[in-house]
């Protein structure tokens, strides 16, 4: 049985990896071995950060809500508890958006939360 060298397959595989490594710095874009390692690591970073992004946005929304609530003499936790007691079911993304874009509506929600806490 003759030996198969697989030159075409190897070249295609290497081209595919080097194409994915386009834009990397230094030898990580030109040398196959380091490019392959970096492509694998980049995939791990991407996987991790897709999950991290959700946590980061939630933290951002909470920070914005807290800042807006403190302008109305209320802490974030008391505001959220007051909204829950008042039966107002609004998520943090929408509440953060209201705090930035529509201050009057946010002030009404804060006053309802304060009433519910009394």
Curated annotation (Swiss-Prot):
One Gene Ontology term of the molecular function aspect: structural constituent of ribosome
Swiss-Prot/TrEMBL keywords: Ribonucleoprotein, Ribosomal protein, RNA-binding, rRNA-binding
CDD domains named among the record's database cross-references: Ribosomal_L20
Origin: domain of life: Bacteria
GO cellular component: ribonucleoprotein complex; ribosome
GO BP term (any one): ribosomal large subunit assembly
Family: Belongs to the bacterial ribosomal protein bL20 family.
Function: Binds directly to 23S ribosomal RNA and is necessary for the in vitro assembly process of the 50S ribosomal subunit. It is not involved in the protein synthesizing functions of that subunit.
Protein name (database record): Large ribosomal subunit protein bL20
Organism: Oceanobacillus iheyensis (strain DSM 14371 / CIP 107618 / JCM 11309 / KCTC 3954 / HTE831)
Gene of this entry: rplT
